[in-house]
Amino acid sequence: MEYALFKNRSYQGVISKGFGLYFSHFRLFLKTSWLMAIIFALVFAALEMLLSVQLPSLSATIMKQELVLKTGLSPEVAQQYLLAVGITLLLILLYIMVEALTVGTVLNKLKEHHDTNTMTVPKRWFYISRQMMGRTLKGYVFTIVTMLIPVIVLAAILVGLLYIASDALTTWMIIVTVCYTVLGLLSLPMLFVFMKYVMNKGKSYFSLLGSSYARGLRHWGHIFTTLLIGGLTICVLAGICCLPTIILAQAHWSSQEGFLNGDPLGMPGYITTLSFITYFLTGFILVYICMPMLMIVYYMYGSIETFEQEKNKLDI
């Protein structure tokens, strides 16, 4: 099966080639990324433990002190809660960074495929390919910042409108929903910008941003359809993978709700260890469930680039 990147393809062809490249080279991608996937899974598990165990437990303690016991919030609990929130925010930043570095190990191989149409299998299992990590991390940061700017500007405008017409809350909520939906749809070409930046070393992000975004916007329908169909498949698999995590998190939340109402926690002593192991395994498996999306975006980028090159030749 031929996996050339630069070929004009329909969305079906892009998705098919993306999954095909992934499954035909699964051992290569596993060997390239498994160490970073373990680090990602550890961060994922730690973050999930805070969100599903520690923060709900502290929240239940605070609510019990304030609403049930009427004793007021103790300084110790307040400090613990603020510390947990601070650690959670740091873990979210670490999560984004480790995710970018994990993606970078795979993009290193896709860059090799981009340049030579081949990919070599690493000789060692205990090896982290670092060539594309820095560029991928910069691409992540630049893309997130670029997307956050219009979000913040729009939020400021909408808050100003709410202040002017505070009595029209329902209308304001509809406007917010519509505005952010449109903004989200308009941000889809940023995936093309990201892939273009990563695959073209030597070019700065912001020198590519305007022209690449305009090019992606011209192919918005192709990008939307590709991401919708490919993403739905991956989301279903990811949802199935996350079921044990969701069930455990719900059990923790229900236990804390019972504690708030005066019931004992009722959770076995090993639940913390079981939860961490479950979250870790879920995080590790999620890396490889979501990885085909990288290949889909990669081939989508190649298809758009080929279409534009062929169009320019015809114009000449």
PLM-predicted stretches and their roles:
Residues 61-92, 104-192:
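Transmembrane alpha-helical insertion/packing segments
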Residues 3-42, 122-149, 188-238:
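Interfacial aromatic "cap" segments that immediately flank transmembrane helices
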Residues 2-6, 17, 54-79, 103-116, ...:
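Juxtamembrane transition segments at transmembrane-helix termini in multipass membrane proteins
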Residues 13, 24-25, 165, 182, ...:
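Intrinsically disordered, low-complexity regions enriched in small/polar residues
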Residues 32-55, 84-100, 138-162, 172-187, ...:
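Hydrophobic alpha-helical transmembrane segments in multi-pass membrane proteins
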Residues 4-19, 24-27, 34-81, 85, ...:
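Generic N-terminal leader segments that precede the first folded domain
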